[in-house]
């Protein structure tokens, strides 16, 4: 089970979050739910493009990046643990960007696999390595993966990072008005702008048909009286048409309900993940009826078990929280006053006491994650 580690990053002072199965993260406004997703997104982008570009593109620069309670000499840390592997980077800000001479370490138990210090010195399994300037701006983990593909330990961590996907702020309006660009079919965009292109690709490729079927069957389950299939029109852009039960004339997606389009997006986000991956979705409850929210969680759990996925939802929804009444250990709370966050709900409140209520009811009544406690 992987664990996300964050220190002194925006609203997060110290975070240590074991990730697995389907979980929800909740908290009062401003406690750092979206920041957790940004941490995952920065890690993923840094592996692809290097840390300076990841911070610039994902966060708009490093201004105000350090937690306000952290001292000036305290580093910002992002990291992941996987079994006995531990990887982390320490960010050193300089102006509006992040210095590429960042400290980075990968260890296995008590053994150091590689370390790069703040001066740029790089040591891999006890031997000093001279990196060309282009490689020096990359993560050390990326360098080891490319130049030592036989290193199984580095490969395990790299595969974990490669399979992180973060989704937020879906562009429903853009999809209605413009559809998806036909050429963008490599992976699902963070805001889902190419979701129709990806769905058409999945439908037409035998190896990806299961992904399309997951979305299609999920929509049928969530909207039994509204949805009876989907088709696509393609040119330079891909648009969609939705069939209703008993009607052979499809509706253009521009006329479809927000809830249907939102659910389609959410199911596609889950389906896009590869086996063993991590999918993080910000506040999926928007535009969804409670019945659809329940079907979403049901489908997410089944897909997670089948494909060994970690699916993370951030939420303010009592309905979504209620789907975890029997699993309070999968509800994590960014609760003020705790040194290490998030706190598992069954550790924050007695499990026997929790059994007397619904989690959503307790959330509404401010028994945890209360805005008034900020």
Protein language model features and the residues they cover:
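C-terminal lobe/lid and adjacent interdomain/linker elements of RecA-like ASCE P-loop ATPase modules
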Residues: 295-374
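Conserved ABC ATPase signature
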Residues: 212, 220-224, 228-271, 278-291
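Phosphate-binding glycine-rich loops of NTP-binding sites
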Residues: 21-60, 257, 262-269, 299, ...
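Phosphate-binding P-loop
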Residues: 14-20, 271-273
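The start of beta-strands in P-loop NTPase/AAA+ ATPase cores
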Residues: 2, 277-278
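N-terminal pre-Walker A segment at the start of P-loop NTPase domains
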Residues: 1-13
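Conserved P-loop NTP-binding catalytic core
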Residues: 38-100
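Electropositive, glycine-dotted interaction segments
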Residues: 85-217, 221, 225
